[in-house]
């Protein structure tokens, strides 16, 4: 019995050591991701050359972060017992990757949202974004995009809610993932960016081409 207890203790210590190692690695990933995006806060004051320089560096950091995070996910799956910051790092790296990777790891984000490791809104946003980039209607109404709209008999580009698969059930679906009613969301988002966001229920995906 003592032998088995020692084996169990060894396994627990090894697991904790592995968890701590992942936390250190992933928390560094999070910090690097955020640092690489600091420049976007003052982007309006930068020259074109400076924007190119910062963008290139951000892409380099993203590439390194993706190699780290996706290497862990592909080899070990999503590690358990991570810190909130480490879990957030995985989500951010997936979110900042291209469509192929977002689609690949979407099921993991859904699993972790259902487990409470991530917010359900994280899954809703990623799911809608993937569907939009695949040319499909979104589910939760989190994505907006520019589209040609008739304004005062003229055609103008307008920020619009990307088409929704089931408009009648939208608010109900949003509530299941902790999102506010769509009209409230559109109002606050419009005020935040200083530009009206329109939901034209007649628009289809084809209208955004």
What label would you give each PLM region?
Residues 19-60, 67-70, 205-206:
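Immediate post-signal-peptide N-terminus of mature secreted/exported proteins
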Residues 51-59, 91-97, 156-160:
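Second-shell loop/turn segments in exported
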Residues 70-145:
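Mature extracellular/secreted ectodomains of secretory-pathway proteins
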Residues 153-168:
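Short, 15-30-residue, compositionally biased linear elements
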Residues 173-209:
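C-terminal partner/receptor-binding element of secreted or periplasmic proteins
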């Amino acid at each position: 019995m003592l032998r088995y207890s020692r084996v169990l203790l060894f396994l627990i210590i090894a697991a904790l050591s592995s968890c701590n190692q992942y936390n250190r690695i992933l928390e560094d990933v999070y910090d690097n991701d955020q640092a690489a995006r600091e420049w976007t806060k003052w982007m309006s004051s930068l020259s074109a050359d400076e924007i190119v320089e910062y963008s290139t560096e951000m892409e380099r950091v993203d590439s390194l972060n993706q190699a780290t995070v996706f290497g862990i996910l592909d080899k070990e799956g999503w590690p358990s017992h991570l810190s909130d910051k480490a879990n957030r790092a995985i989500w951010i790296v997936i979110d900042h990757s291209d469509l192929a990777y977002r689609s690949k790891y979407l099921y993991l984000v859904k699993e972790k949202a259902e487990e409470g490791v991530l917010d359900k809104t994280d899954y809703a946003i990623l799911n809608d974004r993937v569907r939009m980039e695949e040319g499909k209607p979104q589910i939760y109404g989190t994505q907006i995009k520019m589209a040609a709209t008739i304004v005062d008999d003229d055609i103008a580009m307008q920020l619009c809610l990307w088409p929704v698969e089931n408009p009648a059930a939208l608010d109900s679906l949003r509530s299941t993932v902790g999102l506010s009613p769509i009209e409230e969301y559109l109002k606050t988002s419009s005020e935040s960016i200083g530009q009206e966001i329109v939901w034209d229920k007649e628009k289809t995906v084809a209208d955004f081409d």
